[in-house]
Curated annotation (Swiss-Prot):
Entry's localization field: Plastid, Chloroplast thylakoid membrane
Topology relative to the membrane: Peripheral membrane protein
The gene coding this protein: atpA
Name the UniProt record assigns to this protein: ATP synthase subunit alpha, chloroplastic
PROSITE patterns in UniProt: ATPASE_ALPHA_BETA
Keywords: ATP synthesis, ATP-binding, CF(1), Chloroplast, Hydrogen ion transport, Ion transport, Membrane, Nucleotide-binding, Plastid, Thylakoid, Translocase, Transport
Source organism (scientific name): Citrus sinensis (Sweet orange)
Entry GO MF terms: ATP binding; proton-transporting ATP synthase activity, rotational mechanism
Enzyme class: translocase
Catalytic activity: ATP + H2O + 4 H(+)(in) = ADP + phosphate + 5 H(+)(out)
Length: 507
């Protein structure tokens, strides 16, 4: 028979009493009434906030979007296949946030900032709210520094500044993504952090973009946020805000950032799907009433910060797809009215072999020449005027049989100017090369060449100028002015190269 030692028992009880920690926890718990199509209806979550994260019994996270008198409408961040009717749901008391750090550079992540490139976890000590308020008027300053895209047509006639929002709009397969990716490639060595957000794209298209960045060394300063076409609507809706939060992290650390949204119309479609399933009343094109606010609160986060906040910047390039050139549809008109200008890509120009297929006539930058260096302003003013006159003349010349010599010359000049705007994909040009190209065209040095020879001549001229007249590049990059000395050097190079080129062509 075992003997019970009273002192041992009393010691154990005393220890347990000392270790007892009286902690009162209030947990807000509800019950699943209905689940399906990425939406759950919850009963009993009385004190949940709008936009609060809720956790289901089997681990799925959701966002409380509809707060109704009898239940709460929650959108699921996952397939939610294991959620059962009657299971419990817990309110977390948190709003959606993501970890942020320098370690994200060079990585491919999803809308929840989890890596999807198979290269392990990303370390981060800080976190940011996915949705945070845009900088106010006092916190900003006007845009004055250029963000070079490397594309002559844009940098000369539709210039983009750091902190600007410029829409890239056009039909499918007109090179919209190519313009955006070329801009990222051109930021190499410019100390600009780039974020590329792919919303509802094909996984193969995203992989192609990532491969291009890796081959060209652009992933060193780029983060790719990808939610492909098979992702749940909730994650497609969140992806742009995740990208903006990452770009903001760098912006508030006195860095310059560039963010590409490809494309917000897919985000609007995902939001429409969520809203209709939540039984919100539909409006124009079945979009909910707050679809304008969906995009405005995203794009307003792009800014050029004032000196008190460190002069960082976030430049946004949203890409919107139109249906057979219709820019008067709901989402295109919304985004046009939010942004500071648009670059319009035309299917007709693309099919005619003019690539990048930028329709300069209806594209506009509301920042204008404030976002150009002085040297570019000096040579580019003439280009836009001559191209506009050429477009008008070309339409007229189709009906006229006999044209006078001056008109013929103007048409010939216009055709050569159009030729110099053509560029291969993933071949951005430096500002110095652009200035040299525009000057050569607008001052008539290409007029004596055949149209087919123009591009070959310009490529050879760029190489010749770089090797034989390096002072030209030094003058432009140091002074930012197209000085008389630079002009003289350029004229010499053009004459010398033209003689060599014409001799080569004879043999």
């Amino acid at each position: 028979m075992t003997t019970i030692k009273a002192d041992e028992i009393s010691n154990i009880i005393r220890e347990r009493i000392e270790q007892y920690n009286r902690e009162v926890k209030i947990v807000n718990i509800g019950t699943v009434l209905q689940v399906g199509d990425g939406i759950a209806r919850i009963y009993g979550l009385d004190e949940v906030m709008a936009g609060e994260l809720v956790e289901f019994e089997e681990g799925t996270i959701g966002i409380a979007l509809n707060l109704e008198s009898t239940n709460v409408g929650v959108v699921l961040m996952g397939d939610g296949l294991m959620i059962q009717e009657g299971s419990s749901v817990k309110a977390t008391g948190k709003i959606a946030q993501i970890p942020v750090s320098e370690a994200y550079l060079g990585r491919v992540i999803n809308a929840l900032a989890k890596p999807i490139d198979g290269r392990g976890e990303i370390s981060a000590s800080e976190s940011r709210l996915i949705e945070s308020p845009a900088p106010g008027i006092i916190s900003r300053r006007s845009v004055y520094e250029p963000l070079q895209t490397g594309l002559i047509a844009i940098d000369s006639m539709i210039p983009i500044g750091r902190g600007q929002r410029e829409l890239i709009i056009g039909d499918r397969q007109t090179g919209k993504t190519a313009v955006a990716t070329d801009t990222i490639l051109n930021q190499q060595g410019q100390n600009v952090i780039c974020v590329y957000v792919a919303i509802g794209q094909k996984a193969s298209s995203v992989a192609q973009v990532v491969n291009t960045f890796q081959e060209r060394g652009a992933m060193d300063y780029t983060i790719v946020v990808a939610e492909t076409a098979d992702s749940p609507a909730t994650l497609q809706y969140l992806a742009p805000y995740t990208g903006a939060a990452l770009a903001e992290y760098f912006m508030y650390r006195e860095r310059h950032t560039l963010i590409i949204y490809d494309d917000p119309s897919k985000q609007a479609q995902a939001y429409r799907q969520m809203s209709l399933l939540l039984r919100r009343p539909p409006g124009r094109e079945a979009y909910p009433g707050d679809v304008f606010y969906l995009h405005s609160r995203l794009l307003e986060r792009a800014a050029k910060l004032g000196s008190q906040l460190g002069e960082g910047s976030m430049t946004a390039l949203p890409i919107v797809e139109t249906q057979s050139g219709d820019v008067s549809a709901y989402i295109p008109t919304n985004v046009i009215s939010i942004t500071d200008g648009q670059i319009f890509l035309s299917a007709d120009l693309f099919n005619a072999g003019i690539r990048p297929a930028i329709n300069v006539g209806i594209s506009v930058s509301r920042v204008g020449s404030a976002a150009q260096i002085k040297a570019m302003k000096q040579v580019a003013g003439k280009l836009k005027l001559e191209l506009a006159q050429f477009a008008e003349l070309e339409a007229f010349a189709q009906f006229a049989s006999d044209l006078d010599k001056a008109t013929q010359n103007q048409l010939a000049r216009g055709q050569r100017l159009r030729e110099l705007l053509k560029q291969a994909q993933a071949a951005p040009l430096t500002v110095e090369e652009q200035i040299m190209t525009i000057y050569t065209g607008t001052n008539g040095y290409l007029d004596s060449l055949e149209i087919g020879q123009v591009r070959k001549f310009l490529v050879e001229l760029r190489t010749y100028l770089k090797t034989n007249k390096p002072q030209f590049q030094e003058i432009i990059s140091s002074t930012k002015i197209f000085t008389e000395e630079a002009e003289a050097l350029l004229q010499e190079a053009i004459q010398e190269q033209k003689e060599r080129f014409l001799l080569q062509e004879q043999f």
